[in-house]
Amino acid sequence: MVHTAHQDTDLAAELRADVRRVSTLLGESLVRQHGPELLQLVEQVRLLTKESKEAARGGADATGPWSAHDVVAQVRELLASLPLDQATDLVRAFAFYFHLSNAAEQVHRVRGLRTRQEKDGWLAKAVSEIAGQAGPQVLQDVINGLDVRPIFTAHPTEASRRSVLDKVRKLSDVLAEPTAEGTSARRRQDQQLAEIIDQMWQTDELRQVRPTPVDEARNAIYYLNSILTDAMPEMLTDLSELLAEHGVTLPAAAAPLKFGSWIGGDRDGNPNVTAAVTKEILQLQNQNAVRISIALIDELISVLSNSTALFGADQELLDSITADLKNLPGLDKRILELNAQEPYRLKLTCIKAKLINTGRRISASTYHEPGRDYATTPELLAEFGLLEASLRNHSAGLVADGALARVRRAIAAFGLHLATLDIREHADYHHDAVGQLVDRLGTEKAYGELTREERFTFLGAELASRRPLSGHPIKLEGTADGTYDVFRSIRQALHTYGPDVVETYIISMTRGADDVLAAAVLAREAGLIDLFSGKPHAKIGFAPLLETVEELRASAEIVDQLLSDPSYRELVRLRGDIQEVMLGYSDSNKESGVMTSQWEIHKTQRKLRDVAAKHGVRVRLFHGRGGSVGRGGGPTYDAIMAQPNGVLEGEIKFTEQGEVISDKYSLPELARENLELSLAAVMQGSALHRTPRTSDDERERYANVMETISDAAFARYRTLIDDPQLPAYFLASTPVEQLGSLNIGSRPSKRPDSGAGLGGLRAIPWVFGWTQSRQIVPGWFGVGSGLKAAREAGDTDQLLEMMDRWHFFRSVISNVEMTLAKTDMEIAGHYVSSLVPEELHRLFHMIRDEYELTVAEIERLTGEMELLDAQPTLKRSLEIRDQYLDPISYLQVELLRRVREEQLSGGEIDERLQRAMLITVNGVAAGLRNTG
């Protein structure tokens, strides 16, 4: 990327100025709302905590004569003396600083994007590299098969309310407008910013009730509306122009980027997602898709004023208008008269009318009327083909490639359904439903008594049979009926919205091939699959979700067994010879640590690639990544480029969760940048990484070193996880028990029937708790032991070579380094000394020792004196953030201490205390830009 140091310096200066500006405005707001005393208290606490950090780190920059212990004692004494209302205002002030500085940072990122030359973007770089290294034909092949799918999930990691996020976005919009200091424009802008900050201060940042899945769907739609109408069409237009320079075309109806959603389809562990809820959310998505389409059509109507009095139009287009007018007798006669010689406007008016009718039909659950509404997205897109052909044939090719193509590509991406809905359910629920159906037949052996192999054989034979297990609708017992009902709901949804509304059914906790066949048999019962009739069909596909290390290691055997079954192989053929497999990053990390999880997932991708090739199918990998490194997070571009060779064939799916969505997609420019990154990485990986970047010898040597690292890291991690006192330590040293009160998401934080302990705790609250207490164990623990083991085995030179030559290894180490930089053992020690019983302190010593070892090993590997030396701007940013983050952590400890004292006394916890405690949780999340 061509980007000068001078530009970076200017941008950094602008960012610092913006942060100072909004901080000053926040201070003025605090004085307006509460008088000068609150602002004075904020500064007193900030300076004290800053001094304690400096003293703890050696005192080189300390400004006072006190030891770290003395300063911490002062902070504790001050905070313990604060009345509850004052403590609440104090923590809100620090939390609001992060909301405002985060907004300033987003504006800074947007400015950085705008300073780049037009030809210096990620897509321009990808197109140029592919055309230059592989040739235009390879580039065309990649474009033809490009299918990138970000999947929005409702995973509860966004701690901020939409009401707050909306105001933050509004503040970002105002801040982004350039004004000169001392001008009237700057004064007006400051007035606007001050007004927004006052509004934010008087807005409750905590949710009073837990959101429903429908609420979560509305939140996702909020972001999708902007992405699908602004960021994506413009980006695809630019991509089309870049490709044209190399003689490559982006087909007019192509949809290289499509969004999906789990919201309303993810049933695993969420009893609130019922068939009725799924139906309601699909209808909500359709209403928004129709509304967006109509708005886009209105834009085209205003543009396409081409007149037949000056230029002609294709007869096929004119004939279609005649047919439309016959089918739509209720159109406004005045519009028809005004546009009598403007066929494109007439056609678009008819398309708009049919879209309105489509929305009404779906809302009323009535039947499709051919010619009056649309049954499928392809039917709608075919109308644009008529418009395009006529424009090209009558000297308006630029219009066809411009305004028309922009709208056509947008509608091709979201269709009548807005986002494709994945359905996910736990494997055990399918076996329960199948078992009830089978046992009604009076078989010799009860279904529940069958081994996995026996179940696979039985289910394979059942899938091959045309005889259903039940010839008529029946009601099953318990949760089985709800499971069975979902498949019937999918069939109805496909009939109502078309084949793109639901494409994939995900089986979580897949441990064997029989788990996938059980879901397929239920789909067959619901009429979604018919493999051997005169018109065979498979209306949905099935994706095993591999979540634990054991499942990842068995991945090749599971998929090989599946594809070896003739009936299932026929099902995959009917789905275009694509087998989707989802890889779960969160649970494998929680179970085995970050290094082993990442390595096992990397190896799994290689194995799945080879199994798919053996059976003549393509594997589409679905990466279930969270926002934090402890749940597979990290830069998207690096993650995609770090995949093994031959894995990418233009197709990929990945989850976008919680706070990641607001961070990546809240501003149109940021949304575009993230979409560009994803598309560019998939294009480059598909075209230029078909063969290994390293030799056979290198790959073998690197793999051997990784096994050494992984084994040692895993052993060290399990030493901590298997410690019988860890659950007590985790609950004592973190605010994880307060997570449920935050009302972040509709899904419970523990798996149903999971009992006590950490085993049933989901990965999100697991990472959440460690992050809040600044220990962030899931993002690095064990890595130091792993690297040390490799070094002591004589692999130091190999490690340095791997950093230089192997994208995967370099990406993992980079993510671990970032997490270590956000980890703070001084603050974590304050949590432990204040909240954790003495007999559990040994666990903190174990964590701190591994932290120090990991930092030392990372610095040895990178050649840095300190973490992030190679990224000084980021390093400085985190140091500045600590000045405002540390006070929130100290306040959290104090408030958590008060909460627990009230719990021990048996009294009811003061609602104001609980509220203040939860605000600290929001504040730490905003400060670290991570929850779980």
Curated annotation (Swiss-Prot):
Transmembrane segments: none annotated. Its EC number is 4.1.1.31. Gene3D superfamilies: Phosphoenolpyruvate/pyruvate domain (1.20.1440.90). One of its GO terms (molecular function) is phosphoenolpyruvate carboxylase activity. It is an enzyme of class 4 (lyase). The active site is at residues 155, 590. Keywords: Carbon dioxide fixation, Lyase, Magnesium. Its cofactor is Mg(2+). InterPro entries: PEP_COase (IPR021135), PEP_COase_bac/pln-type (IPR022805), PEP_COase_Lys_AS (IPR018129), Pyrv/PenolPyrv_kinase-like_dom (IPR015813). Belongs to the PEPCase type 1 family. HAMAP family: PEPcase_type1 (MF_00595). NCBIfam families: PRK00009.1. Forms oxaloacetate, a four-carbon dicarboxylic acid source for the tricarboxylic acid cycle. This is Phosphoenolpyruvate carboxylase. It comes from Paenarthrobacter aurescens (strain TC1).
